């Protein structure tokens, strides 16, 4: 009522922009020991370890364990909180979960209230040469710092249309898609000696997702007038259309 200019009117608010990484209106905060109210009167309120917030929105939630305690306990804690309905309302904005002790870290996407946690999609971060990073300081610097944490949430997650569950890319998929997009941005199209490239890996490694994300990054960057996503099998095309 005090805002007579806008009271009763529709107001547009810009609360998140994946392109404004460490710049523009993006503001980053860390919330230590966030308190989660439970839906049950029997259960006590829960308290997490910490969250990364972008413009006040919780996007990455972390559970920590001391040295010698398996990160499986941190994963189980996250799964338990989700089963208790903790990540609802404002906390449903959490995109990525991280379970960490000083010697090991895994990260995974929030499957949402209707999804199921699948340990097969709990990933360890690795460097460009696919050497696993285990020390918490290395993981924090490479994955959880800005700009990488913002980029992971904004560019390297995929909403799977086939099951409605969010997917997050493995580290080698991130490096591949990023390098392909960078190569296109630096290409000199007037040069007649342009060469193509290919993504090679084993079955089940996520080549289709890497290809799709590469095409999406190139298209959104406006570095190419048109991007064609071509598949060599009808069933692969049908699957990709459903998923992406």
Feature locations, PLM:
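ATP-dependent helicase/translocase motor core
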Residues: 1-226, 231, 235-244
